[in-house]
C-alpha cells in the first residue's frame, strides 16, 4: 500500500467517522506481537465504529495489516488539520489535450481517487506520445519515450 493509498483510505475514514474512530484506530495499531485481524479486532473498544472493523478485516485480507500504523498517522494528521487536504495529481501529455480528453481523464481519476483530487495538466513534447500520470507517490507512465527506452534496453541485453 502506497502513501497515497493510505491517504485515500484515511480521507474516507475522516469523512465518515468521529473521535471514537481515532481512538479505536490507535488501539488497533497498538497491538503487540503478530498482527492478525482477530488480535486487532479484540483490541478495539466495544463501541468501535463498523467502518474501523471493516478496515481492519480488509487490511488483513489483503495482507496489509502492517500498514495500519501508516493509516492511523494519516488519519491523525487530517484530524489535526481539521480535515482532509486535497490529493494532488499531474497529467503530463506529449501534446495539449482537448477539453473532452481532460474531462474524461479527470472523471476516471476522480472515480478512483475521490472527488477531492486536484489535477494539473501540462505538456512535455519529449514524451513523443502517451501520458504520464502522477497521483501522490504513484506514477503511471504510458509515454512512447519510456516504451522506446524499454525496447532499447531489451535489445541491448539480448
Swiss-Prot record:
Signal peptide: none
Keyword Ion transport found: yes
Membrane topology of the entry: Peripheral membrane protein
Superkingdom, taxonomy of origin: Bacteria
Subcellular location, record wording: Cell membrane
Swiss-Prot/TrEMBL keywords: ATP synthesis, Cell membrane, CF(1), Hydrogen ion transport, Ion transport, Membrane, Transport
MF term (GO), any: proton-transporting ATP synthase activity, rotational mechanism
Assembly and binders: F-type ATPases have 2 components, F(1) - the catalytic core - and F(0) - the membrane proton channel. F(1) has five subunits: alpha(3), beta(3), gamma(1), delta(1), epsilon(1). F(0) has three main subunits: a(1), b(2) and c(10-14). The alpha and beta chains form an alternating ring which encloses part of the gamma chain. F(1) is attached to F(0) by a central stalk formed by the gamma and epsilon chains, while a peripheral stalk is formed by the delta and b chains.
Name assigned to this protein: ATP synthase subunit delta
The organism of origin for this protein: Roseiflexus sp. (strain RS-1)
